[in-house]
Amino acid sequence: MRCPFCGHAESQVKDSRPSEDGAAIRRRRMCPECGGRFTTFERVQLRELIIVKRSGRRSPFDRDKLVRSVGLATQKRPVDPERVERMVNGIVRQLESMGETELPSSTVGEMVMKALKSLDDVAYVRYASVYRDFKETSDFAKFLTEEGLSDGGEEEL
């Protein structure tokens, strides 16, 4: 594995163990050139998934992009990062077990929304605001009412 610090082509594995949920192998590595230490995760990939965007463009499924988008939704919320990791692992397993090689981005988006709804209401609304492309505050109000998350108040924003 290439060193992320100096770019040296080789690194030594110093420690290897299963991750908390057992879905990955966590490896501590050290670069023999610069002495830099870093962590890598090794995961099983059952099949190559292609995501079909709304525009029709196709791109390989990127687990890290999913983690980042969920991370943005849960940022500064009292959500344990391990719960987020388990949630993402569950979504990836569901996607892989569908048996399809190409999936619409809407499938991923709906899975994330469903998982976030049970994890944290604020993260759910944050994600929905981007996924459903809210343009103004009335979009938020309508969504909150439809989802039963509104307190019923008609306050000016």
Swiss-Prot record:
Zinc finger (unnamed): 3-34
GO biological process, one term: negative regulation of DNA-templated transcription
Cofactor: Zn(2+)
Family membership noted in the UniProt record: Belongs to the NrdR family.
NCBIfam families in alphabetical order: transcriptional regulator NrdR
Function: Negatively regulates transcription of bacterial ribonucleotide reductase nrd genes and operons by binding to NrdR-boxes.
Name used for this protein in its record: Transcriptional repressor NrdR
Biological source species: Caulobacter vibrioides (strain NA1000 / CB15N) (Caulobacter crescentus)
Taxonomic placement: Bacteria, Pseudomonadati, Pseudomonadota, Alphaproteobacteria, Caulobacterales
